[in-house]
Structures are given as C-alpha cells and as structure tokens.
Design a protein with these regions (language model features):
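Rossmann-like flavin
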Residues: 1-70, 277
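Generic, well-ordered alpha-helical scaffold segments in large soluble proteins
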Residues: 7, 25, 53, 57, ...
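Patatin-like phospholipase A catalytic core
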Residues: 42-67, 287-289, 295-324
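Helical element adjacent to the flavin cofactor pocket in flavoenzyme catalytic cores
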Residues: 53, 67, 72-144, 175
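A glycine-rich dinucleotide-binding beta-alpha-beta segment and adjacent secondary-structure elements
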Residues: 63-64, 73-77, 111-124, 302-367
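FAD cofactor-binding and catalytic pocket of flavoenzymes
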Residues: 168-297, 304, 328, 333-360, ...
Length: 367
C-alpha cells in the first residue's frame, strides 16, 4: 500500500522507503515470486460464499493476490505446497542464493553476534540433531558484515543475547502481531470449501476506515485441528461429518504495538519471553471484525456461524448475533476469549532516522 510506505517515510524519516523510491523494488520482487491477482479458477466455493455475502451487504471485495506459479489447486497451502508451486523461500531465494555461491547450514541456530571494536565481526552458532534436538557441534563464522534476518521474534533475541547496545531502549519493544480470528459458516449445500486455492478473495470495505481486512479461507481439517478448533469426542465426530458444508474466513484487525520480546539469562541456557495481550480497544476490534465476518456469512446464506471463541459459541441467525457477542467479554487480559492467530509479527527492531526512537538506521545499520 503506497499510503503505508509514504507514512513510514514521513513519520520515521525513511525517505528511501517512500512509495516513489521503494515501490519499484517491491514490484520487482513481486514479479520474481509470480505474485498475481487470483483468476476465476482460483476462487473456490468457500470464496464464492464470501462474494455472495458481500454483494448482498454492498461491501467492497476483490480477488486476493498470491505468490504461486500455475496453482494446482490441491488445497494443502498451510501444510506446504506438494507440487512446489507456491513461491516460498524454499523454492526461490534459498536456491537462488545457493546458485550464486551462498552456503546454507541447516539445523544451525545463531546464538549470538560476535563484535569487536564496536563492529559486528561474525556469529556464533550451535548445530543440533534434527531428530533428537541434541547439541552436536558449535560453529563460528567470521565476516566483515553481518545481516540479521530472523524475523520480529528471533532478531531481537539474538541481539539481546549478543548484548548489543540498545541506545533507544526500543529493542524487542513495539511488537505488533495484526491478530486474526477464523470464523466458520455452515451452509445447506456441500461446499468442500477446503478444496482449491486456500485464499480466494479479500473484503477491503473496512481496511482504511477501521483496519479490518477479511480473507476467505477454510483450512483443510488436519490444519484446523492443530489450532484446537474442532471440538472433542462426539462433538468432534459431528463437526467432521459436516465439514464439507463449511466455509471459513480469517478476520484481521490492527493492534497498537504494545508487545515485547525479551531474552533473560545466559546466551545458551537462558530463556525468552514473548508478551502480547490486547487492551480493550484491540479486543473490541477483534470482536468487531469477527462480527462483520459473521454478517457476511449470514448474508451469503449460512444456516449457522461458529464464532472463534473458547466458549464454542454458535449463532443460528443474524438476529441473534449481537446477543451472542454480548457474551464475549474481555475476561483475564483479553487473552482467553478469542482463538487468535498471527501471520505477521513486526516492530521489534524498528527502523528510523532518530537514534533515540529506533533500533536501526535508514541504512539498515544498528545504531
């Protein structure tokens, strides 16, 4: 989104990340990763129910974009594409880097960055057995430049274990996760909504106004089971018998970046803390986005909607939705009500022109 890029440029002094300067690089990567707008055959029955609901509600929607090359429509996206058509790093950047001389070490975890005279001079790592998890060897790599790209969780942890100076006090802070919940709708006719492309369409009616974005997508049964959303005993059996009648969406909302990641203790024997819980405003945003998803399903003809709560709340009519949602309360720190997930934690090593507000300079160098 160009508005996001321009916001980074103006708010944090990151002129090189403005849409004018940075967009060409993003477009180049998009071409490399085969990112394209879903075509008609990539929009499955689950997505069509979302479309029907949006059309009736007069909500804006559009086909989603995916990084996939000639999708085989197998539906195993969450478990790894069986035909390697999803353009993940496993089939793109890693083999491309290897072809240009990069050496890749599997089962090897960077413990800390080695520094000398105020500069990063290499890394210290340990190698583990992939089956037993046992520590089998140590490794040291000397380098003129060290690039940390371990995501919003492990990048600050490595820096903290390395005792890198934190001038701004922001290292590991400002964790945002953009939480989402999965809402399921049950329909009269069989949909087999887990077949075909996982993500078909997105609802962008509320993206700019409220920060809500809703994507169609019903996980295959075993993937949903991993989230603990499929009940137990007889209830599980009944749920599975009806799985072909379900459609699903992921309802995203925004958060304020109040979480943190922290390492305590020795670099090898210490432990990490990942802390995030919603405040009441963020909690209400999660509830509102889930409610919109439910209304879309009812407008699309759903007989029942399953709300993403630990209470296993089921709604039989749009007229009962508000009453049901009144039962969803903040509870203990807002953490034990919704079954929330995150795909995109970020913010823990933020970049900026002010060394007292940011961890990383606009050049990518740590202050």
């Amino acid at each position: 989104d160009d508005a996001v890029l321009d916001g980074w440029a103006s708010q944090y002094g990151l002129e090189n990340l403005s849409a004018e300067k940075f967009r060409p690089y993003l477009d180049g990567v998009a071409d490399q990763l085969q990112i394209h707008i879903n075509e008609a055959h990539e929009i499955n029955a689950c997505a069509h129910k979302v479309i029907q609901g949006c059309e009736k509600m007069q909500f804006s929607w559009k086909p989603a974009q995916r990084n996939v090359k000639q999708c085989a429509l197998t539906g195993h996206c969450l478990a790894g594409c069986p035909s390697d058509r999803k353009m993940s790093s496993l089939v793109t950047h890693l083999p491309w880097a290897a072809a240009h001389g990069a050496r890749i070490f599997s089962d090897t975890e960077v413990v800390r960055v080695l520094t000398r005279d105020g500069r990063a001079r290499g890394v210290e790592a340990r190698i583990t057995d992939p089956d037993s998890g046992a520590h089998v060897a140590d490794m040291q790599v000397d380098a003129d430049m060290v690039v940390l790209a371990a995501g919003a969780i492990h990048t600050p942890l490595i820096m903290q274990r390395s005792q890198i100076e934190d001038r701004s006090g922001q290292l590991g802070r400002n964790l945002s996760i953009q939480p989402f919940t999965q809402v399921l709708g049950k329909f009269k006719e069989p949909l087999y909504g887990f077949r075909g492309a996982l993500v078909g369409v997105q609802v962008d009616e509320f993206t700019r106004t409220d920060g809500f974005t809703i994507f169609s997508g019903l996980a295959e049964p075993e993937s949903l089971l991993a989230q603990g959303d499929m009940k137990a005993g007889k209830a599980h059996i009944d749920f599975m018998k009806n799985y072909k009648y379900y459609a699903g969406v992921n309802a995203f909302s925004t958060d304020q970046g109040r979480g943190y990641v922290e390492w305590s203790g020795d670099a090898y024997s210490g432990d990490k803390t990942i802390h995030w819980n919603p405040n009441r405003e963020e909690f209400n945003n999660m509830k509102a986005s889930a409610a919109l998803a439910a209304r879309i399903f009812f407008s699309g003809g759903a007989e029942k909607v399953y709300m993403p709560t630990f209470q296993n709340l089921e709604v039989d009519s749009v007229f009962a939705l508000d009453e049901t949602l009144d039962k969803v309360d903040f509870g203990l720190k807002g953490m034990y009500t919704f079954r929330a997930n995150s795909f995109s934690p970020h913010g823990t090593c933020r970049m900026g022109a002010d060394p007292y507000q940011a961890v990383v300079a606009p050049t990518g160098q740590v202050y």
